[in-house]
């Protein structure tokens, strides 16, 4: 069961929901952070790997840090924000912003209007949510894309 925590605080384009990310509407595209090597061996990435597979498809896209790899599943896009070279590395805010810009471009070209995601980069990667959310707001400010962030 998801619980909506806010609608639009101070003009924010991010809505926060307490609940399971994978219970989001089936029309929402999803996003999370991974490394170039597509290991997805820990954290929420493991759940993405189990649910959507496609590791070879992701690797074949040969995306680098600051880019985005994409799978299409059941009529929606699954975005893999490439924020670091190896799974054992830590991401930078710069690479996160570049990968978000790449995702935004793909969303706009493909008519994506709703994105759901966890607090990207803030679990095992240890980025600070106040910085990440500010980057998200900045990157998507000139779009009509709605972002829903799920927390457990």
UniProtKB/Swiss-Prot annotation:
N-acetylalanine modified-residue sites: 2
MF annotations from Gene Ontology: ADP-ribosylglutamate hydrolase activity; O-acetyl-ADP-ribose deacetylase activity; purine nucleoside binding
One GO location term (cellular component): nucleoplasm
Stored Gene3D superfamilies: Leucine Aminopeptidase, subunit E, domain 1
Domain Macro: 2-152
Role summary: ADP-ribose glycohydrolase that hydrolyzes ADP-ribose and acts on different substrates, such as proteins ADP-ribosylated on glutamate and O-acetyl-ADP-D-ribose. Specifically acts as a glutamate mono-ADP-ribosylhydrolase by mediating the removal of mono-ADP-ribose attached to glutamate residues on proteins. Does not act on poly-ADP-ribosylated proteins: the poly-ADP-ribose chain of poly-ADP-ribosylated glutamate residues must by hydrolyzed into mono-ADP-ribosylated glutamate by PARG to become a substrate for OARD1.
The protein's name in its UniProt record: ADP-ribose glycohydrolase OARD1
Gene: Oard1
């Amino acid at each position: 069961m998801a619980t909506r925590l806010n609608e639009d605080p101070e003009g924010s384009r991010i809505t926060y929901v307490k609940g399971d990310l994978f219970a989001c509407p089936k029309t929402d595209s999803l996003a999370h952070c991974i490394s170039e090597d597509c290991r997805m061996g820990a954290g929420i990435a493991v759940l993405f790997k189990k649910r959507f597979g496609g590791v070879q498809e992701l690797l074949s896209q040969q995306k680098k840090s600051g880019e985005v790899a994409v799978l299409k599943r059941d009529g929606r896009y699954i975005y893999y924000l490439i924020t670091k070279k190896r799974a054992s590395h830590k991401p930078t805010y710069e690479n996160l912003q570049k990968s978000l810009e790449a995702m935004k471009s793909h969303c706009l070209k493909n008519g994506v209007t709703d994105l759901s995601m966890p607090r990207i980069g803030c679990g095992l990667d240890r980025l600070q949510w106040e910085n990440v959310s500010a980057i998200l707001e900045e990157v998507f400010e000139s779009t009509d894309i709605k972002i829903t962030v799920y927390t457990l």
